[in-house]
């Protein structure tokens, strides 16, 4: 049975956010690199660093937290995996869902790479719906 790397990074980011940890380390693959790039561009994470340890590459993500006097409190954002290995979900560009009326982000895997719902609508292409972020 194969590993679902997208579900692993979503779960690790969600767990670190709920535990108010500022730094998360995830495995580096081409898919995770594209998803992390989208998260950084959309402002859900603060910083990304590439780290190499024992011939394995990792991404070190710095999550965005607001500072409080007593302790940092998290910006509430949710990630949800939609298409999974047992049940793939595809959509054409006209039927890509809008999360929170366009405030959230849908990440798609298209024939032109991994992109957000806004980019896919502008280019007029659909694809596999990987996850929702809001």
From Swiss-Prot:
* Main localization (coarse): plastid
A single BP term in Gene Ontology: translation
Question: Which InterPro entries does UniProt cross-reference here?
Answer: Ribosomal_uS8, Ribosomal_uS8_CS, Ribosomal_uS8_sf
Q: Does the keyword Iron-sulfur apply?
A: no
State one molecular function term (GO): structural constituent of ribosome
- Where does the protein end up? Plastid, Chloroplast
Q: Does Plastid appear among the keywords?
A: yes
Q: Name one Pfam family in it.
A: Ribosomal_S8
**What PROSITE patterns would the database entry show?**
RIBOSOMAL_S8 (PS00053)
Keywords of the record: Chloroplast, Plastid, Ribonucleoprotein, Ribosomal protein, RNA-binding, rRNA-binding
Cellular component GO terms, alphabetical: chloroplast; ribonucleoprotein complex; ribosome
Q: Which family does it belong to?
A: Belongs to the universal ribosomal protein uS8 family.
UniProt-listed PANTHER family = 40S RIBOSOMAL PROTEIN S15A
Subunit notes for this chain? Answer: Part of the 30S ribosomal subunit.
Q: Give the protein's biological function.
A: One of the primary rRNA binding proteins, it binds directly to 16S rRNA central domain where it helps coordinate assembly of the platform of the 30S subunit.
NCBIfam families on file: PRK00136.1 (NF001109)
What is the protein's name according to its record?
Small ribosomal subunit protein uS8c
State the organism of origin.
Ipomoea purpurea (Common morning glory)
